[in-house]
Amino acid sequence: MEEIKCIFCEIESSQVVIEENGYQGKKCPQCGLIYVSPRPSFDEIVSLYGHDQAHISSASHISDSFQKRLYARHNLGIIRSVVKSGALLEIGAGAGYFLDEARKIGFYPFGLELNPAQADFIRSELKIPCEESPLSTTVFEGKKFDLVYHCDVIGHFFEPISDFRKMNAVMQDGSFLIFETGNLGDVDQHYFKYFQRFQYPDHLFSFSTDSLSKLLDRTGFEVLKIYRYAILPQLILNQLTAGIRQRFFKSARQQGSSANGGRAGKTAGGIQQSRMGLTLKMVIGPVWDYLNYLLRYKVGALLPKKGRPQSIIVIAQKRKTVG
């Protein structure tokens, strides 16, 4: 464990705004960056993914195809307004559904994913090149990319400035960096109660618009546009229904397991009930995912945003090398 300062302002903040799982999130009074301090070592953080101990398991990522593809198609609609094809690198590719959707519309996809099960799924099931390694200038034999993308990954970077410089190094001049993240550093603290968890310690940094601008400027990028979506209604809905959803989906999983494995002597009526539970989950799950999608990207685009929780999509371009 080590104490750190704001990576931009080099200020050692004493303002603790988040406490979770024995860790503290401190907020820089100048740029709004929220950072975990003291924090675990790099090897300890990597082990969370290598041993599948992250809050969202690899099995959940892989099974959540409908939601992942829905969100991917939305973001690809924005991406195609600035770049329509080319070599695409996704950092933190999860189960690879964004890459698969991008391939359908003309991109050549490549992924980086630390979780072994998900990386293997991308390679073996989706047939997409994927390296099970952190970002470096030697990934995919030093290939240069036309687009680098990541979603809800920036908070995991151990050294964001170093990692964004690596992104810059693997990109063609004038190519695009596009990513989705939160704006927690801009959010009034009384809204923090609507977050069910902050996923400490695997989320090490939470950015404000100011700190994101500093990060991009220092690492050779120019911000072209930021899309903003208010997520407070989505947070409230998920908080209010958390207990119900947990009980329902747990019951459906158990019923599905019983229907597939089955105990000896299980009645026909019991099997039918189990199958009905599994079918109900298969119907309600996508409806729930679509409702969350509408709240985030359609309703959220219209609602007030200042000081409130948002999901933001940043469009940035690599500055061209002079000479």
Where are these regions (language model features)?
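Conserved N-terminal segment of class I S-adenosyl-L-methionine
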Residues: 1-151, 161-166, 228, 297, ...
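Short, glycine-/aromatic-enriched active-site segment of Class I SAM-dependent methyltransferases
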Residues: 179-206, 210-217, 229-231, 239-241
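A SAM-dependent methyltransferase catalytic signature shared across enzymes that methylate proteins
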Residues: 7-14, 210-228, 290
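Short N-terminal helix/helix-N-cap motif within the alpha/beta-hydrolase-1
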Residues: 158-162, 189
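A C-terminal cap/extension of S-adenosyl-L-methionine-dependent methyltransferases
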Residues: 4, 228-323
